[in-house]
Every structure is written in structure tokens, then in C-alpha cells.
Amino acid sequence: MPDTLLEVTMQRRDFLKSASLAVLMPQVPSLMAQMRSALPLKITDIRIVRLKVVRETGAIVAAWNPGTVITERIGGGSIVEIHTDQGLSGIGPGMDAAWLEAAKAQLVGKNPFDLERLAGPLRYYIGGSPHSISALEIALWDLIGKAAGQPVYKLWGADKDRVPAYASMIQLSTPEERVRMAVQLKSEGWKAIKLRAHYPTLKEDVQMVEAVRKAVGDGMDIMVDANQAQSFGSWQPGVMWDFRRALETARELQALNCLWLEEPRLRYQFDELARLSSLVDIPIAGGENNRGVHEYRWILEQKVYGIVQPDIMVADGVTGFREIGALAQAHHKRLIPHHGGGNLGTITHLHAIASWPNSPWIEILHDPPAAPYTNGFAIFENPPRVDPQGYLNLPQGPGLGVEIRKDLIVA
């Protein structure tokens, strides 16, 4: 029995939080059990499939990694395939080949509909590669959707059939070029642009945002990313912000009617970030490099961010990613995922966002001409496109609803 009013209050809060999570998480396990009995499948093999490079499209320097030149290309990389005894297969982003045999040991001979039962062993035996866990679970959900004959987002509980996309810049560039880009994107139907705040001084960052706001008016939303949470520790390349710069920047961006300020401090400066969130009205966003439901529980309970941004390739696989989504709903917080890598991770984000009423945007890395989002989507036979109204429509085919171009597969 609780002895104090505080204990009663805490027990009531924990009960309500648990009850909220139970209501918010779609009843996938029971649905999976029903489909498992109706659709017996057995995993027979897992393969890593390499993709041909079609062509290079240019070189860029990412704002968060100054001095490092990235060659952008169409094609290349790899995907993972999970095959079954019924001829169905699922696809996911490429996984680390070093973990392939461990993955086979846990999945071959199993029914993909037992995903909740398989999630624990995957984390135990492949825990050193969260990217690989995510790749495998994405492929499993693609397989489950194909077996059920439904798009993944409908299995997760569809809230919407299209999602507004925002164009996320990669380079710092110049104010003049970012103005040109913003005006062009607005004319193409994009509803929002995310700029990078990486100039040596606060004044230069603000002047860039001011120039873009003046050019596009109030008819286009602007987000700003400081990318201050890229490393585990207290060092990263480029300019380092202190709390004062974060606070002053947030106030300036608030006056410019920006939607949010992203990652203005180090990844684990939770106390400072919570304090910053309490001092400004503009939402502080972040979390793309945080991993695990436990970290997000702390972030949400301590009101670290106004908007949480998990990435399915980092957070904790599809299983953990969706649990984080339910947790954000229980705390009445918006969840707007990080970009997901640009191809199959991004497509999986699209399905998840379509199942969450508290998720109003999808991030699309799009910095043409060298790095348009179409580069990542070019590996698909039926690539989604941002429509003239600025939306990505949900694929309606079963599973993820996309297939890999056969001409790109390395034999």
C-alpha cells in the first residue's frame, strides 16, 4: 500500500501512462496471431543483395561534417532480402554482412508473423548493429504485408493516405543560394524547407534565415537544424554552440516564425535542453541519434524536446521505433522522424507517419542538383514522388509497396 500522497500520485501516473500506451499501440500481436494461423510461412534464407551504381550526380559537403566531401550517386549500396518457403520475400535496407550468420541463426525456420517473439533475440545477438536490426525488421514487415495483401501502414492503423514533405537541405551554402533554392521549391509545391545553421556566428545564421523568410513570405514553413548532437561526447567538427547561443538563436528564429529549432545542444545535455525548451515558445526538436525506448522515455518525461525525431535506422528497429511513437502519443508530443537514410528507411517512415495522428511531416533529404531525393528513390521500380501540392502519397501495394529495379541487382 502506498504511504504518501506522492506515492499515490506516482502510481496513478504510471497506471495512466501504461493504459495510454495499451490504447495507443495498435493491437498488432493479436492480429499477427490470427494471420499466423491463416498464413503459415517459414523463413528459408536471408541474403544481402548488392546494387549497381548507375551514375554519380555530384559532390557535396554536409553542413554537419565540414571538410568531408560526399559523392552523391544513383544506385549502389545494398538491400537485404528475407525469403520464405511460400515464395514470398521481403526487402529492407542493406545490413552489415558481419551479422548475416547471426541473423540467419535467429530467423531461418521461423514464421515472420512471430516478429514480437523474434525481436528480443535479434536485439541480444545483433545488438552491436542497430542498423542491421532495423533492416531485418523492415524486411519482415514488408514480408508480412505481402502475405496479408495489405500496405504496412494499414496493418499499423491508417490515419492518413498522404503526408506533407519538407525539403531538408544538406549543405550550408550561401544565403543567396538558399534563397534561390527556397523560391524554386515553393514554386514546385513544397510546403517547407529546413535550413542548416552552421555559420561561425549567430548573426550570419539569422541573416540567412531572414533572407529566406523575406523571399518566401509566410507561404512556406521554415525549420532550422543546428546539428549539435552528432557525437556521443562533447566534440564534433565545425562550430560548437553553448547554451547562450542556443537560447539567443531560438529567440531570433521564434521572431521569424520558424517551425522549430533542431539539436541546438549536445545529444545528452538533457537538463540544458529541457531548460531551453521551458524558456522559449519555438519548439526545440531532436533525438535522431538517441537509441532505445528508455532514452525516449526520459526525454519525454523530462520535457527535453517539444518535438521528438527518432530514426528507424538508429532508434531500436521497427519494434522500438513504434513503441517510441506510442510513447510520444501518450505524452501528447509531436513525432517527426529523422530522414531514415533516403530509400527503404524513408519509405518505412512514410508508413509509420501515416499511422500516427501526431506526426504531421516527413523529412526528405533534397538538395538539388547534386543531391535530390530522387537519387535515393531511383532504386525503386515504382518510386514515390512529391506531388505538386507538396505531399508524398502512400504506396498502395502490399508490404512497403515498392520493389527494387531488377536491372540494378548485381548477379
Model-inferred region functions:
Residues 137-172:
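Glycine-rich, aromatic-flanked loop segments that form ligand/cofactor-binding clefts
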Residues 162-280:
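Metal-dependent enolase-superfamily TIM-barrel catalytic cores that perform enediolate-based chemistry
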Residues 2, 14-33:
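N-terminal export signals
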Residues 40, 45-49, 83-148:
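Metal- or metallocofactor-binding catalytic centers and their adjacent structured scaffolds
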